[in-house]
C-alpha cells in the first residue's frame, strides 16, 4: 500500500508544528515540497523533512542520504532552517525482509550521513516494524517517530520515542491533502521547552 502525502497552507493557530514531507518516489522530489516548505515558514509552522526509503543495503542508504542532502542544498535549506529533524522513513516490506541486522545497518548508515552534514536525524517506522526489524540498542541515539493507530494512550513499543503518529484519518480545516485526511502526531518535548 503506497501513501501519497501533501500539504497546503494551515495557520499556526490551527497547528503548532508540522513536518514538511519530502517523499522519494523513483528518485523524484515531492512536487509540492517547495511550496509546502515555504508556506510553512511564512506561517511560522515548525518545519522538518522526511525521506521515504527503498534502501536494502548500506550502500543504497548512503546514496539516499546524499540524495536527501542534495535536495536540501538545492533548496537552500541548512540545519538552522529546520525546527524538526530529517526523518528516515523506512517501511517497505522488501527492506524488512532483509533482516533485523541489515535494516538496522541501513538505518544507521542513513542517519549517520545526515548527522555528519549537521542535520538532526530521526527514524520513522510503524510500531510493529520497530519492534521486529530494528536493533534498538543501535538506533536509540536517534530520535524515534513511531506510527501506531490505536485507541491506547501510547504506541505499543517497549522503548522510548520522540514522536507518535496516532492517526491517518484526521480532518483539519485548511489542510488540502487531496485525500481528505491528514496524519496527526504528538511530538514529545521537555516540559521546560520554551518556543
Where are these regions (language model features)?
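Aromatic-lined carbohydrate-recognition surfaces of secreted/lumenal glycan-active proteins
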Residues: 114-132
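Hydrophobic anchor at the start of a short beta-strand
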Residues: 47, 120-121, 144
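Short beta-strand/turn micro-motifs composed of small residues
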Residues: 51, 125, 148
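Substrate-binding cleft of extracellular glycoside hydrolase catalytic domains
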Residues: 1-111, 115-117
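Short, solvent-exposed loop/turn segments at secondary-structure junctions
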Residues: 93, 128-130, 151, 168
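Functionally critical loop-and-helix segments that line ligand-binding/catalytic clefts
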Residues: 2-5, 137-195
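Basic/polar, cationic surfaces and motifs that engage anionic cell-wall
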Residues: 102, 123-124, 135-142
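Glycine-rich, charge-decorated loop segments at or immediately adjacent to ligand/cofactor-binding or catalytic sites
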Residues: 60-63, 129-139
Amino acid at each position: 500500500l503506497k501513501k501519497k502525502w501533501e500539504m497546503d497552507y494551515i495557520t499556526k493557530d490551527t497547528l503548532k508544528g508540522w513536518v514538511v514531507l519530502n517523499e522519494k518516489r523513483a528518485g523524484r522530489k515531492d512536487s509540492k515540497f517547495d511550496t509546502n516548505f515555504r508556506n510553512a515558514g511564512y506561517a511560522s509552522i515548525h518545519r522538518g523533512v522526511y525521506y521515504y526509503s527503498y534502501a536494502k543495503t548500506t550502500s543504497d542508504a548512503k546514496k539516499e542520504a546524499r540524495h536527501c542532502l542534495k535536495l536540501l542544498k538545492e533548496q537552500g535549506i541548512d540545519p538552522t532552517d529546520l525546527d524538526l529533524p530529517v526523518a528516515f522513513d523506512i517501511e517497505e516490506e522488501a527492506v524488512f525482509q532483509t533482516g533485523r541486522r541489515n535494516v538496522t545497518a541501513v538505518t544507521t548508515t542513513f542517519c549517520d550521513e545526515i548527522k555528519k552534514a549537521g542535520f538532526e536525524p530521526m527514524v520513522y517506522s510503524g510500531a510493529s516494524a520497530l519492534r521486529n526489524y530494528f536493533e534498538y540498542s543501535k538506533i536509540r541515539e536517534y530520535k524515534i517517530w513511531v506510527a501506531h493507530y490505536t485507541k491506547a494512550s501510547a504506541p505499543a513499543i517497549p522503548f522510548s520515542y520522540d514522536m507518535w503518529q496516532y492517526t491517518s484519518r484526521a480532518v483539519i480545516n485548511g489542510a488540502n491533502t487531496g485525500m481528505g485526511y491528514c496524519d496527526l502526531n504528538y511530538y514529545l518535548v521537555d516540559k521546560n521547552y520554551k518556543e
